[in-house]
Amino acid sequence: MANQRIRIRLKAFDHRLIDQSAQEIVDTAKRTGAQVTGPIPLPTRKERFTVLVSPHVNKDARDQYEIRTHKRLVDIVEPTDKTVDALMKLDLAAGVDVQISLG
């Protein structure tokens, strides 16, 4: 696979889970002889929700919730055929969203 690059974007709500998955990808790629850049932490998206506690009165009583979406980027610069096969067989955690693009 000459002059190719595999870009892997990871998304998860738990930062420990995404770091563990990124490390598994990097270790697998390096073990098969590919050159790896990353994992690069991308900005964390914070969604905040405000909910009224009382169903009728007391507008001052509110709860605030937050969902954080952590993102990482891993570039595999010179993948080999072994690298692609090893990445296909890799079993990552269920809470991690993986997007792969070839460039």
UniProtKB/Swiss-Prot annotation:
Pfam families: Ribosomal_S10
Molecular function (Gene Ontology), one example: tRNA binding
Keyword annotations from UniProtKB, A to Z: Ribonucleoprotein, Ribosomal protein
Chain coiled-coil ranges: none
Ranges annotated as spanning the membrane: none
Gene3D superfamilies associated with the record: Ribosomal protein S10 domain
SMART domains: Ribosomal_S10
Cellular component terms (Gene Ontology): ribonucleoprotein complex; ribosome
Source taxon at top rank: Bacteria
A Gene Ontology biological process term: translation
InterPro entries noted in UniProt: Ribosomal_uS10 (IPR001848), Ribosomal_uS10_CS (IPR018268), Ribosomal_uS10_dom (IPR027486), Ribosomal_uS10_dom_sf (IPR036838)
Quaternary structure and interacting proteins, as annotated: Part of the 30S ribosomal subunit.
Family, as annotated: Belongs to the universal ribosomal protein uS10 family.
Function statement: Involved in the binding of tRNA to the ribosomes.
Name of the protein described by the UniProt record: Small ribosomal subunit protein uS10
Upper classification of the organism: Bacteria, Pseudomonadati, Pseudomonadota, Gammaproteobacteria, Oceanospirillales
